Amino acid sequence: MHILFITDNFPPEGNAPAIRTYEHTREWVKNGHTVTIITCSPNFPDGKLFDGYKNKWIQREIIDDINIWRVKTFITANEGFFKRTIDYVSFMFSSIIFGVFTKKVDVVIGTSPQFFTIISAWFLAKIKRVPFIFELRDIWP
């Protein structure tokens, strides 16, 4: 099965959503599934890119056989409603644009607490006519 997972956070970020998603996807790969992550370049919580990363339109990375596509977003520190919302909405649009080109997907998963990842994942599932899973771990804001 090919799982497309939409998440705003993924390692090397060390927050709970990033670690949780990594642990889930690593187990799915160990069990023979193909996993593609669409996320942004690591910058949480300070809004500064981690060393070795750029905020480019698309960057491919593989960690433990997990396919990771990092997409361009508006990057800001984790403070202030307006800037954070622009960051989240920019990720939603970027993940939709690049998610459309992910081939042969069997299921699309979107994770909270970032609300706009859910919209992106739902939209991609509808376009691809595959099941949508909403992983609710935290209610935002």
What are these model-predicted stretches?
Residues 9-11, 81, 105-107:
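A short, structure-level motif marking secondary-structure boundaries and short turns
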Residues 15-16, 47-48, 80, 118-121:
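Short glycine-/acidic-enriched loop or helix-start segments at secondary-structure transitions
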Residues 39-99:
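A conserved catalytic-core segment of Leloir-type glycosyltransferases
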Residues 84-99, 105-128, 134-137:
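An aromatic- and histidine-rich active-site surface loop
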